[in-house]
Each structure stands twice: as structure tokens, then as C-alpha cells.
Amino acid sequence: MYTDYEGRQHRFGQRHNACPNSLVYRKYARALADKLAERYASNPHVTCWHVNNEYGITCFCDNCQNAFRVWLKDKYKTIDALNKAWNMEFWGHTVYDWDDVVVPNALSEGIGTEKTAFAGISIDYRRFNSDSVLECYKMERDAIRSHNADVVITINLMGTFKDL
């Protein structure tokens, strides 16, 4: 289950409720796409696949925090490069270890309901989240393609949704 900007882990019952970096979610999302594609691969009435619906959840859980650190290491290579890119000397926010990096939410540098005091971490977290959601799409797409390489696969996004 996903954790919102305020740090609250949600429970069952909402329309979008999965963390895109949850290994459990990914396992079952892939399995579901695989089983459906296997069953309907040769059905002539299936002309295309719609994967997920309106991707766009931004999760702030421990899975995301750990994956964000890995994403940052890949992008910046060193803590010094990260500190420079984010101008972390400002207000004495220098980080000395990758484990010092926390998700930018209301429990860390939050200002208001959706932004933080440091643009660098906020922008990178949105980029990371976009990459995480893209990985989920590709995972489901590839599961479908393994049964029907030529089928059209699509998604839909909300035109005014700013998080991707």
C-alpha cells in the first residue's frame, strides 16, 4: 500500500493504492498481465491492450526511499555531486551518506501540501517517480508481448496531472 505526502500509509479501499516500487505489487501486476495475455493472446476480438489506468500515484514509503537512493547513486555517482547539484550547503543541509537522503515529504522538508524547501530533491523525486511508473508499465507491456508480439498496447494519462 502506498504512503502519501503526509507520511500516512494507506489501507485497502482506494482506486490507486499500490507502491510502484513494491516488489510484491510488481510480482502480482506482472503475473496478472501475463496470465491475461496468455489466455487471450489468440482471441481475435482482442485488438489491443490497455495497461493500468491513469498512472500517477506518488508514493513516499520505505520501498520508494530505498529505490530513490539507488536511483540517485546511479545518476550522481558521488555524494559530493549530489550535494552540489542540490545546493545542499544552503541552510546546512549537506548529506554525508546515501542513507541520509530521505523522501521529500511533509515529514522532512515539506512546505504546504505538495512541495519542499529544496527544489533539487523535489524535482529529482518526481523524475524518480516517473521512472518507477515507467518501469511498471514496461514490465506489464513485456509480459503481454511475450504472448503476442504485435498487439497494440496503450495507457491513458490525465491531461492535467503534473506528477509525471
Regions found by a protein language model. Name each.
Residues 2-164:
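Polysaccharide-binding and catalytic clefts of secreted carbohydrate-active enzymes
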